[in-house]
């Protein structure tokens, strides 16, 4: 990124947050970017300590062979420079290389099966199979843990939350785009909001 582009982004971001008022500006700087289909890499510690633990080295981004991990820019306040996966664009293929290179323990070493980035949630009002439009098994076929994390009951996909890794392969493959980039199956980052036990 060129200096001019950086300063433009910085200026527009600071200007927008200051115009919104001091309370909104403060909230924007500390609001987690982890939301529906926006996930931390595998093995990430809970969000409330992630920004303090991650040193923003970018090793996870460099090592990812699928280029699914990106670093957040300055518009994300205290989370700038931390890694994020946009599951509907490029999902996590669970190669686990990012976990191996993390020097701080922000990404804890877990197996593929133990990974919990989030949980897939099927929107039964928009899923082709659930509304009876056609027989679609795309999410089932793409799941690396089919018949464990996702099963077919009466040919309809059902998520087993205890086995779902939240990798986003189902979301990425889903042919239905609803609104604001959401699909008929989306990943909710439930584990990122877990409270740290001291």
Language-model segment annotations:
Residues 1-198:
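Non-ligating segments of multi-cofactor redox enzymes
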